[in-house]
A protein has these predicted regions:
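Short hydrophobic/aromatic, small-residue-rich stretches within specific transmembrane helices
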Residues: 50-54, 130, 221-225, 247, ...
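Generic alpha-helix structural propensity
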Residues: 27, 31, 47-50, 54
Length: 311
C-alpha cells in the first residue's frame, strides 16, 4: 500500500494532465508541469522529471502515429533487435537510468529514421544538417537546465507560469502563417531553451502554427527537439545526479490517457484556437495566484529500499 500511495500521485498527474490536454488543446507538458509543481516539486526535481516525461511520452505518441514492424527497422531490423535489448539490459545492470534512456533513444531513432525516409527526397535536409540542428538545440536545452539550479525554489512556479503565458502570446501573435518566416527558426530555437528551463515542450503548438513556406528546421522540429531533450536529460543527470522514478509512472498514466482518449488535433489553417489560449492563460494565472510550496516530490519507496534504483 505504501508503494501504491507513493506512485499514485505521479500516475494521476500523467493521466489527468493528458486528459485535460486532450479536451482543451492545452499543451500536454504544460498540464503535467503544473501538476508536478502542485505536488511540491523542487526546481531540480521538476526539470529532471519533465525531461524524462517528455522523452518517454512522445516516444509513446510517435510509436502510435508511425506504426513500425520489426523487419522494417533501419538500424536493427529483425533479429538484430536483440542487440539493443541486450545492451539495454547490460547498461541497466550498471546504471538503470542510462539503460532506460538508451532503450528509448534506440526506438526513437528507428521512428525518426522512418519519418526521414518518408520526407520528399528533394526537399529533406541532409543527415549532417539534422545533426547540426540537434546539437544547437541540445546546447540551448542544456543551458536552460543548468540555470534551473539558480532559480529560488519558492519562485520556480513563476518560471512555469510565465513560460505558458509566453507561448500563449506567441500563438496569438503568429496567426498569419505567411508572416514571420524570417524569424520563425529563431523562435523554435528559443523554445528549446525554454524546454530546458521549464520542461515545457511546445512541439504540438509550434508545429500547428508552422510558417508557409516551411523551413527545414520546422519540418524536422520533432526530431530536433526530442534529440535535444535526450541529451538534456543526460546532462541533467550528470549535473544533478537525480533520476525521477515517479516520472516513469507519470508516463504510464499519460500512455493510458492517450490510449483511452487519443490526442487533441490542432487545426493547421487559420489562427490558433482562442478558446485554448484563454484556458491556458487562465490556468497559468490561477496557478501563480495559488503559489504552490516546493516541499519536494513524494518519496517512491522502491527508490530508497533497493540499490537498483539508489541514485
Amino acid at each position: 500500500m505504501e508503494m501504491l500511495s507513493a506512485i499514485a500521485p505521479f500516475f494521476m498527474a500523467g493521466l489527468l494532465g493528458t486528459v485535460f490536454a486532450r479536451f482543451t488543446g492545452i499543451n500536454m507538458s504544460m498540464c503535467v508541469l503544473l501538476m508536478f509543481l502542485y505536488m511540491g516539486a523542487k526546481p531540480v526535481e521538476c526539470i529532471a522529471a519533465m525531461l524524462m516525461f517528455n522523452v518517454f511520452t512522445y516516444f509513446t505518441v510517435y510509436s502510435q502515429l508511425h506504426v513500425m514492424k520489426i523487419k522494417s527497422f533501419t538500424f536493427f531490423p529483425g533479429v538484430r533487435l536483440a542487440i539493443p535489448i541486450l545492451i539495454t539490459i547490460a547498461l541497466a545492470a550498471l546504471n538503470p537510468f542510462i539503460g532506460i534512456v538508451f532503450f528509448v533513444f534506440t526506438f526513437l531513432m528507428e521512428i525518426f529514421a522512418k519519418i526521414y525516409k518518408e520526407m520528399d527526397a528533394k526537399s529533406r535536409p541532409t543527415k549532417g544538417k539534422i545533426g547540426q540542428m540537434v546539437v544547437i538545440a541540445a546546447v540551448l536545452v542544456t543551458i536552460g537546465t543548468a540555470l534551473v539550479q539558480f532559480v529560488p525554489e519558492n519562485y520556480y512556479y513563476i518560471v512555469g507560469g510565465v513560460t505558458i503565458l509566453i507561448y500563449a502570446f506567441v500563438m496569438w501573435r503568429t496567426g498569419d502563417r505567411r508572416k514571420g518566416t524570417a524569424w520563425w527558426d529563431k523562435l523554435l530555437y528559443a523554445s528549446t531553451f525554454l524546454t530546458g528551463l521549464s520542461g515545457i515542450d511546445g512541439t504540438d503548438w509550434l508545429t500547428a502554427m508552422r510558417r508557409n513556406p516551411e523551413s527545414v528546421l520546422s519540418k524536422c522540429y520533432p526530431i530536433v527537439i526530442n534529440g535535444a531533450m535526450i541529451i538534456g536529460l543526460l546532462a541533467s543527470y550528470a549535473m544533478y545526479q537525480y533520476f525521477s522514478l515517479g516520472a516513469l509512472f507519470a508516463t504510464i498514466g499519460s500512455a493510458v490517457g492517450i490510449r483511452l482518449f487519443g490526442l487533441y488535433e490542432h487545426k493547421e489553417k487559420g489562427s490558433f484556437s482562442y478558446l485554448t489560449l484563454g484556458i491556458a492563460v487562465l490556468a497559468a494565472l490561477v496557478f501563480m495566484i495559488i503559489q504552490p510550496v516546493p516541499t519536494g516530490f513524494p518519496v517512491v519507496p522502491m527508490a530508497d529500499q533497493t540499490g537498483f534504483f539508489d541514485f
